[in-house]
């Protein structure tokens, strides 16, 4: 029987751990974890995401601060706000919602966030710590961190002897995911658009992670029987069966056919997606614990 992972359930258990660690930190040290979210402009999708993040931060018991800046905010004004948040001892996590309006350069802003407050895990210092296997010192990008919770709950902490294939080499997901699997002792192949005979490479995987943004690219005959398949893709495709002009969300994996072969699989939606915000909260309490000199919780 194939196990279909319920991402909402796993995310809820992560949030429970965050809540108890947050109240323990506050009762033992008087420190309340603080998350600042910065949004520039009025992109509706970004505002939806930010509201969800702020709401979840409050639910976790954090000090939740939202800075909404007008579309015409200058690079200097945004940089000044980040500098202010860097210097604020009540803020342990800083998140700048991307994408920024076209006239702003996101990279200098992201790299100006203190690495220890970079709860999105996008600072080069955090990327470097992950690449060198320093998982105790850095903060890991939220989506790969969330996918890794699924892997650990399936196989445990030590992946010795297991082959993992990550399709996708983006800085946001593919590279950090490969690094996390490697740090857990898996034998890792990072595949991408230039990989020769991708299906054959995938068939060797005990853990197959797809993150390329190509709807239902991974077919059943790419999957080793009994393997774990983690689908990170999120693609909107036409759904004429739902009526004219209707669409639906699908992943990078042809779910129905792959679910017949895989041992464990994540659906889209409802798989990796809910984990992203949960791991943002996890990173915030980890950052707060470290700054207070306490041992952070494990996820």
Curated annotation (Swiss-Prot):
Any one biological process term the GO annotation gives: purine nucleotide biosynthetic process
Pfam families: THF_DHG_CYH, THF_DHG_CYH_C
InterPro entries reported in the protein's UniProt record: Aminoacid_DH-like_N_sf (IPR046346), NAD(P)-bd_dom_sf (IPR036291), THF_DH/CycHdrlase (IPR000672), THF_DH/CycHdrlase_cat_dom (IPR020630), THF_DH/CycHdrlase_CS (IPR020867), THF_DH/CycHdrlase_NAD-bd_dom (IPR020631)
EC number of the protein: 1.5.1.5, 3.5.4.9
Description of how the protein assembles with itself and partners: Homodimer.
Entry function: Catalyzes the oxidation of 5,10-methylenetetrahydrofolate to 5,10-methenyltetrahydrofolate and then the hydrolysis of 5,10-methenyltetrahydrofolate to 10-formyltetrahydrofolate.
PANTHER family assigned to the protein according to its UniProt record, in alphabetical order: C-1-TETRAHYDROFOLATE SYNTHASE, CYTOPLASMIC, C-1-TETRAHYDROFOLATE SYNTHASE, CYTOPLASMIC-RELATED
Name by which UniProt lists this protein: Bifunctional protein FolD 2
Originating organism: Rhizobium meliloti (strain 1021)
